[in-house]
Amino acid sequence: MSVSVSVDAETNVVGLIGHPVEHSLSPAMHNAAFKELGLNYVYLAFDVPPERLEGAVRGAADLGIVGLNVTIPHKEAVMELCDELDRDAELIGAVNTVRFSRGKIEGFNTDGEGFLRALREETYFDPRGTKSVILGAGGAARAVSFKLATEGADEIVIANRTVDRAERLAEELKEKVGVKARAIGLDGDEIERELRDADLLVDATPVGMYPNEDEPPLVTADQMHEDLIVNDLVYNPPRTRLLEEAEKAGATPVSGVGMLVYQGALAFELWTGEEAPVEVMREAVLEHLR
């Protein structure tokens, strides 16, 4: 689904800054949404190397750009340029959405809320009183674990190849939110033990992401149980080998497409004040992944 965009002197500009950005699905997703609602907006992708971040952000504000999505490697560095941060951005320690408003640079993080909205939509999952096992300890794992913790999760286990990094995240979760959290390695037996009474498994690593779709998953069907929800944050491909393992186990598989769409929908609403056409955005993403 290619989207033609009409631009005039009154078109509102939003966009993405990162390095690199050429494979991003965000322009297709947002421009489809603007067209659906008849909004005079255009979404562009800007490749900004780290040494030019401050100039790009301040220049965008001066040019009257409405807002920006922020991706790797700028999510942490851009925080220093923001005049205001929302609670999620402060907790997670990263910004993925910027809004230029009233002469200020406002920073938000919609990743955690996008993750939870997608999960609730597909499974009716309620984090309260639950146990989750998170694979990975990077930016996506931080967003997911802090959102689960602030929404009432009882226990969060961070599993990472570098256990020290997982331990730092677990300590932050305990200190900032007061949730029961601990760290483990990626040893299969240890993960299997933790999954026995877990409600949710989230893979926040790039394992299985295009072009490495055939990479073996970190968890297999024999380590899962049928009451487990398995959410792979990888969205390309939409159906990963981990999700195939979940199906074999009778568990509930959840693709990463939903988180991508909902974090974008939340940014859309911050910029436009309009309710995002989520299904149009989802279809635009899936069309580009086919």
From Swiss-Prot:
<dbReference type="InterPro" id="IPR036291">
    <property type="entry name" value="NAD(P)-bd_dom_sf"/>
</dbReference>
<feature type="binding site">
    <location>
        <begin position="136"/>
        <end position="140"/>
    </location>
    <ligand>
        <name>NADP(+)</name>
    </ligand>
</feature>
<feature type="binding site">
    <location>
        <position position="256"/>
    </location>
    <ligand>
        <name>NADP(+)</name>
    </ligand>
</feature>
<dbReference type="InterPro" id="IPR022893">
    <property type="entry name" value="Shikimate_DH_fam"/>
</dbReference>
<dbReference type="InterPro" id="IPR013708">
    <property type="entry name" value="Shikimate_DH-bd_N"/>
</dbReference>
<dbReference type="GO" id="GO:0009423">
    <property type="term" value="P:chorismate biosynthetic process"/>
</dbReference>
<comment type="subunit">
    <text>Homodimer.</text>
</comment>
<dbReference type="GO" id="GO:0004764">
    <property type="term" value="F:shikimate 3-dehydrogenase (NADP+) activity"/>
</dbReference>
<comment type="similarity">
    <text>Belongs to the shikimate dehydrogenase family.</text>
</comment>
<dbReference type="GO" id="GO:0009073">
    <property type="term" value="P:aromatic amino acid family biosynthetic process"/>
</dbReference>
<feature type="binding site">
    <location>
        <begin position="160"/>
        <end position="165"/>
    </location>
    <ligand>
        <name>NADP(+)</name>
    </ligand>
</feature>
<keyword id="KW-0028">Amino-acid biosynthesis</keyword>
<dbReference type="InterPro" id="IPR041121">
    <property type="entry name" value="SDH_C"/>
</dbReference>
<dbReference type="GO" id="GO:0008652">
    <property type="term" value="P:amino acid biosynthetic process"/>
</dbReference>
<comment type="pathway">
    <text>Metabolic intermediate biosynthesis; chorismate biosynthesis; chorismate from D-erythrose 4-phosphate and phosphoenolpyruvate: step 4/7.</text>
</comment>
<feature type="binding site">
    <location>
        <position position="96"/>
    </location>
    <ligand>
        <name>shikimate</name>
    </ligand>
</feature>
<feature type="binding site">
    <location>
        <position position="71"/>
    </location>
    <ligand>
        <name>shikimate</name>
    </ligand>
</feature>
<feature type="binding site">
    <location>
        <position position="235"/>
    </location>
    <ligand>
        <name>shikimate</name>
    </ligand>
</feature>
<comment type="function">
    <text>Involved in the biosynthesis of the chorismate, which leads to the biosynthesis of aromatic amino acids. Catalyzes the reversible NADPH linked reduction of 3-dehydroshikimate (DHSA) to yield shikimate (SA).</text>
</comment>
<dbReference type="InterPro" id="IPR011342">
    <property type="entry name" value="Shikimate_DH"/>
</dbReference>
<keyword id="KW-0521">NADP</keyword>
<keyword id="KW-0057">Aromatic amino acid biosynthesis</keyword>
<feature type="binding site">
    <location>
        <position position="233"/>
    </location>
    <ligand>
        <name>NADP(+)</name>
    </ligand>
</feature>
<dbReference type="InterPro" id="IPR006151">
    <property type="entry name" value="Shikm_DH/Glu-tRNA_Rdtase"/>
</dbReference>
<keyword id="KW-0560">Oxidoreductase</keyword>
<dbReference type="Pfam" id="PF01488">
    <property type="entry name" value="Shikimate_DH"/>
</dbReference>
<dbReference type="Pfam" id="PF08501">
    <property type="entry name" value="Shikimate_dh_N"/>
</dbReference>
<protein>
    <recommendedName>
        <fullName>Shikimate dehydrogenase (NADP(+))</fullName>
        <ecNumber>1.1.1.25</ecNumber>
    </recommendedName>
</protein>
<feature type="binding site">
    <location>
        <begin position="24"/>
        <end position="26"/>
    </location>
    <ligand>
        <name>shikimate</name>
    </ligand>
</feature>
<dbReference type="GO" id="GO:0019632">
    <property type="term" value="P:shikimate metabolic process"/>
</dbReference>
<dbReference type="InterPro" id="IPR046346">
    <property type="entry name" value="Aminoacid_DH-like_N_sf"/>
</dbReference>
<dbReference type="GO" id="GO:0050661">
    <property type="term" value="F:NADP binding"/>
</dbReference>
<feature type="active site" description="Proton acceptor">
    <location>
        <position position="75"/>
    </location>
</feature>
<feature type="binding site">
    <location>
        <position position="111"/>
    </location>
    <ligand>
        <name>shikimate</name>
    </ligand>
</feature>
<dbReference type="Pfam" id="PF18317">
    <property type="entry name" value="SDH_C"/>
</dbReference>
